[in-house]
């Protein structure tokens, strides 16, 4: 019996040693595997950080441009960037694209989230060092993913565009990727702020995403936006045109109105973008942040009492009024070099973000025309979508006459600005500084378009038209034209006819304008408006 027990014990010991031997081999195998995976992870990360390689990075720098990652690093708060999809690679196997040398971790775009002055934003930065920043299916997928996340959590999306366009090797998949992005641009419109910063070429299908975003900024001399390049234009129309002439920053900020501002270089653009974001809310559900204000809300501005010339035909600069009224003269003007007869931009009043709209008497006497109407309308609609109060300074003699305007559709385009002000439900405060003539008076956030508070300065002239034109109609053939003009001015070219009818709420001293506006904004902060249900409005596009 004892012998049997010893034999069984020996057998059990043998089996145990065998099991231990097998387990040891397994453990050693498992221990060595993570080392291999970790090495691969680190290698992939290193490759992703290099983008298209040092040679292409150097070429990017020689052009005066930062790399995709350098741009993100400068834009966001230090250490706040959390990258997503670093290991994503393109899926194209045609034209030799499956070769290992044509695979780059992250493909041609860097995506993720971070913070600007402590506030959450999502960002994508196209990497020109990888296939010229061209858009592949994987590239589009990465952008769409962060856009979906931004909509879900309610945070702005910033696109740093530097791309040669669609990746030709991927064919229709690349085009599908563009459409996926366009759809999200439309879905996000009015929900979260969308900002495009063009920092290199942006051609073909790539241009439509920036066009769908709320604001488009460009970098001088290095960024271009066009549907087709100069070579194609030459082949079709026989026009000789350079990239800069066709789609450079100057063209789009002064002629086409496609871009809202242009900056000197990448660093200047990114620093200004950080400043700009401070004015905006994170989403349509989030009020714009209120900054601590050291500029007294009841501050009087004596120089405003003499800023408007006594002669109604003499020009002055509306920016002088705007700068004097807002907090600490800090005004971020939008489209300053396009349609200069109207001024738009963001400022603060007692720490609150406001949208400013003002006619500019220095340019075309402040008349409204096609371009200024479109410029103003889009800005007003953005402010309304994101609950930013509107302050309007009015000095408008009417709509610009002439065949060029009529043939160009001034009636339809002018209606856009009228529509935008009428549709807006945010607090609306209007100050008539001098002329408010004809239909343009109605359009510029008048009481009839449900302006909340409408003020007139003593210099205000609210009438159907100017005295000279009115007299030629009313007193046609009258012997004493000067006396007739004086009579018209006495009766109509002053603020009293509108004031006695309640079309302006008060005639105020210009020096008290800041104090009155700040007080009104405090009261109107709780404004609520309920409109009839509709699927969407039919804007006169």
From Swiss-Prot:
Domain CoA carboxyltransferase N-terminal: 34-292
Subcellular location: Mitochondrion matrix
Predominant location: mitochondrion
N6-acetyllysine modified-residue sites: 101, 476, 491
N6-succinyllysine sites (modified residues): 101, 250, 476, 491
GO cellular component terms listed in the entry, alphabetical order: catalytic complex; mitochondrial matrix; mitochondrion
Domain CoA carboxyltransferase C-terminal: 296-535
One GO biological process term: fatty acid catabolic process
InterPro entries: AccD/PCCB, AcCoA_carboxyl_beta, ClpP/crotonase-like_dom_sf, COA_CT_C, COA_CT_N
Catalytic activity: propanoyl-CoA + hydrogencarbonate + ATP = (S)-methylmalonyl-CoA + ADP + phosphate + H(+); butanoyl-CoA + hydrogencarbonate + ATP = (2S)-ethylmalonyl-CoA + ADP + phosphate + H(+)
Residues of the transit peptide: 1-28
Alphabetized Pfam families for the sequence: Carboxyl_trans
Keywords assigned: Acetylation, ATP-binding, Ligase, Mitochondrion, Nucleotide-binding, Phosphoprotein, Transit peptide
Pathway: Metabolic intermediate metabolism; propanoyl-CoA degradation; succinyl-CoA from propanoyl-CoA: step 1/3
Region (Acyl-CoA binding): 327-360
Positions of region (Carboxyltransferase): 34-535
Function: This is one of the 2 subunits of the biotin-dependent propionyl-CoA carboxylase (PCC), a mitochondrial enzyme involved in the catabolism of odd chain fatty acids, branched-chain amino acids isoleucine, threonine, methionine, and valine and other metabolites. Propionyl-CoA carboxylase catalyzes the carboxylation of propionyl-CoA/propanoyl-CoA to D-methylmalonyl-CoA/(S)-methylmalonyl-CoA.
Subunit structure: The holoenzyme is a dodecamer composed of 6 PCCA/alpha subunits and 6 PCCB/beta subunits.
Name this protein carries in UniProt: Propionyl-CoA carboxylase beta chain, mitochondrial
Organism: Rattus norvegicus
């Amino acid at each position: 019996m004892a012998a049997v027990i010893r034999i069984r014990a020996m057998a059990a010991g043998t089996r145990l040693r065998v099991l231990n031997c097998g387990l040891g081999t397994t453990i050693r195998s498992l221990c060595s595997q993570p080392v291999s995976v970790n090495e691969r992870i680190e290698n992939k990360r290193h490759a992703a950080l290099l983008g298209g390689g040092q040679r292409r990075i150097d070429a990017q720098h020689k052009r005066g441009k930062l790399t995709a990652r350098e741009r993100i690093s400068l834009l966001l708060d230090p250490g706040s960037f959390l990258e997503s999809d670093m290991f994503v690679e393109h899926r194209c196997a045609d034209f030799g694209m499956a070769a290992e040398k044509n695979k780059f971790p992250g493909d041609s775009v860097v995506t993720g989230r971070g913070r600007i002055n402590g506030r959450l934003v999502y960002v994508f930065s196209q990497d020109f060092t990888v296939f010229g920043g061209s858009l592949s299916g994987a590239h589009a997928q990465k952008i769409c993913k962060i856009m979906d996340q931004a909509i879900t959590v309610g945070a702005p999306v910033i696109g740093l565009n530097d791309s040669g366009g669609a990746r030709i090797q991927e064919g229709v998949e690349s085009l599908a990727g563009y459409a996926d992005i366009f759809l999200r641009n439309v879905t996000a419109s009015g929900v979260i702020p969308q900002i495009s910063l063009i920092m290199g070429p942006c051609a073909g299908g790539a241009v439509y995403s920036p066009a769908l975003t709320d604001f488009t900024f460009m970098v001088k001399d290095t960024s271009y936006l066009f549907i087709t390049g100069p070579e194609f234009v030459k082949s079709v129309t026989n026009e000789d045109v350079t990239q800069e002439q066709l789609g450079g920053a100057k063209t789009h900020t002064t002629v086409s109105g496609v871009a809202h501002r242009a900056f000197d270089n990448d660093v200047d653009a990114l620093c200004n973008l950080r400043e700009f974001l401070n004015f905006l809310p994170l989403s349509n559900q989030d009020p714009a942040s209120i900054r601590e204000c050291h500029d007294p809300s009841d501050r009087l501005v004596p120089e405003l009492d003499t800023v408007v010339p006594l002669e109604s035909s003499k020009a002055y600069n509306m920016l002088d009024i705007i700068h004097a009224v807002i907090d600490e003269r800090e005004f971020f003007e939008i489209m300053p070099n396009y349609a200069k007869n109207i001024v738009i931009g963001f400022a603060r009043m007692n720490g609150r973000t406001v949208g400013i709209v003002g006619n500019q008497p220095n340019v075309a006497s402040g008349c409204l025309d096609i371009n200024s109407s479109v410029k103003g309308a889009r800005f007003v609609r953005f402010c309304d979508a994101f609950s930013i109060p509107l302050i309007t300074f009015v000095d408008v003699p009417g709509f610009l006459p002439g065949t060029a305007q009529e043939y160009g559709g001034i009636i339809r385009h002018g209606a856009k600005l009228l529509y935008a002000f009428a549709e807006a439900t945010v607090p609306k405060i209007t100050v008539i500084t001098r002329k408010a003539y004809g239909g343009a008076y109605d359009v510029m956030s008048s009481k009839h378009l449900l302006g909340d508070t409408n003020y007139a300065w003593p210099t205000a002239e609210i009438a159907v038209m100017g005295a000279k034109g009115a007299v030629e109609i009313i007193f046609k053939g009258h012997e004493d034209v000067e006396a007739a003009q004086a009579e018209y001015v006495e009766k109509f070219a002053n603020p009293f006819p509108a004031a006695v009818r309640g079309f302006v709420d008060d005639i105020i001293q210009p020096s008290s304008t800041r104090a009155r506006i700040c007080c009104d904004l405090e009261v109107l902060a709780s404004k609520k408006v309920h409109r009839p249900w509709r699927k969407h409005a039919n804007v006169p596009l």
